[in-house]
Amino acid sequence: MAASTMALSSSTFAGKTVKLAPSSSEITGNGRITMRKTAAKPKPASSGSPWXXXXXXXXXXXXXXXXXXXXXXXXXXXXXXXXXXXXXXXXXXXXXXXXXXXXXXXXXXXXXXXXXXXXXXXXXXXXXXXXXXXXXXXXXXXXXXXXXXXXSLVHAQSILAIWACQVVLMGAVEGYRIAGGPLGEVVDPLYPGGSFDPLGLAEDPEAFAELKVKEIKNGRLAMFSMFGFFVQAIVTGKGPLENLADHIADPVNNNAWAFATNFVPGK
């Protein structure tokens, strides 16, 4: 009995090698294997600041439960931030971001100019023309705004001529920015480098990513502050720096509440 069992068991495994590792054709079958290179995700700007990084701390954490998919750190499209649902669709968000960057750059320059003109006036550079607050009224009047106090230099007599010059100059610059030209080829119309970046600020990609975020944030601030300058000028009849100086001199009396009850502008 024992011998027959032994013979049975030995004949069962006779001549078969035990496989330790299966061959690759058995694992994959005869299908083709393709290897795909996934594009590396751009590294967020590694600044020490928690506000300008890609994983920015959401300031309105209480209001917004979940950030939308399109929201980056720069364009926070949370429920609180985009009240008008302007960034609901991804395409609209991209267009709005483009408009925000372009308008923000303009506003940053404009706010600097508005403050600079008032600063120059305060520093006793005898500018005959009014500050930004009253400039529009002065240009529309017949007497014209003499910007550098000399009538022969920049002597804006016709508002239409000013407008025409602005259209030509800005049209030329924008045309170069979109279509390219002698200044260099267009790589990215929103952030054109080359002659538009004389300081070479966008050479390093990490610094460039951080500067983009700072540009949008500071640009929003500048647009809002420019709006504030206009409201201040309408209500108080003074420029932003004069208002600031008055407020610092006497913060209790010279502030927004002093003008809140005054509904006749400029008085």
Curated annotation (Swiss-Prot):
Chlorophyll a 5 binds at residues 214, 232. It is a multi-pass membrane protein. The keyword Magnesium applies. Chlorophyll b 5 binds at residues 166, 263. Disulfide bonds: none annotated. Chlorophyll b 3 binds at residues 158, 174. Chlorophyll a 1 binds at residue 220. Its main location: plastid. One of its GO terms (cellular component) is chloroplast thylakoid membrane. Pfam families: Chloroa_b-bind. Chlorophyll a 6 binds at residues 247, 256. It is found in: Plastid, Chloroplast thylakoid membrane. The N-terminus of the protein extends into the stroma where it is involved with adhesion of granal membranes and post-translational modifications; both are believed to mediate the distribution of excitation energy between photosystems I and II. The light-harvesting complex (LHC) functions as a light receptor, it captures and delivers excitation energy to photosystems with which it is closely associated. This is Chlorophyll a-b binding protein 3A, chloroplastic. It comes from Solanum lycopersicum (Tomato). The lineage of its organism: Eukaryota, Viridiplantae, Streptophyta, Embryophyta, Tracheophyta. The gene is CAB3A.
